[in-house]
Regions:
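Short, structured coil segments at secondary-structure junctions
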Residues: 54-57, 65
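Asp-based phosphoryl-transfer active-site loop
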Residues: 2-16, 90
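Short, acidic loop-to-helix structural element flanking the phosphoryl-transfer center
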Residues: 16-34, 79-88
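Short, flexible loop segments at the rims of nucleotide/cofactor-binding pockets, characterized by
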Residues: 13-16, 39, 122-123
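Substrate-recognition element of Asp-dependent hydrolases with the DxDx(T/V) motif
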Residues: 26-49, 65, 104-108, 143-147
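HAD-like small-molecule phosphatases
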Residues: 51, 67-147
């Protein structure tokens, strides 16, 4: 058995699509008894639906730049959370320097933290948006995003 690991954005997923050629190569690789792994900065909620729309899935997901690992079905096998107070301190700091909106990946979704102007430069926030007043409600933080 062999294992192939691929990045997602701009590697397997180019111009917002997975080519038929790449999909077939992955499926043939897996049918030959090999493992296919995706390693990405994305969270499961923003990437798994894309694979579902193409009708295939990696054998393992390495997510949030390694902070989370899940099996083929999305069952979490490993998570390294950012201590809550540390994450909140970083997010408050970003707000204080007129950040244009940060993103926060939780174990189950990504939320966009709106700037004081009510804007966000973040993409793919499947968990919606929150304001600085709602920061205290965040838990299970695995990654902080800033553009």
């Amino acid at each position: 058995m062999k294992c192939a690991v691929s990045d997602f954005d701009r590697t397997l997923y180019v111009e917002r699509m997975i080519s038929e050629e790449d999909k077939n190569a992955v499926l043939n690789w897996q049918k030959s008894g090999n493992l296919f792994v995706i390693a990405t900065g994305r969270n499961l909620g923003t990437i798994k639906p894309i694979f579902e729309s193409y009708g295939f899935s990696p054998d393992l997901w390495i997510l949030n730049n390694g902070a989370m690992i899940a099996d083929r079905d999305g069952k979490i096998l490993f998570t390294k959370l950012i201590p809550r107070e540390t994450a909140l301190a970083v997010l408050r700091y970003l707000q204080s320097v007129n950040d244009d909106g940060s993103g926060v990946s939780l174990t189950d979704r990504k939320v966009c933290l709106l700037s004081e102007k009510g804007t966000s430069t973040q993409k793919a926030c499947d968990g919606g948006t929150i304001t600085a007043d709602q920061l205290e409600s965040l838990d299970n933080i695995v990654q902080i995003h800033r553009r």
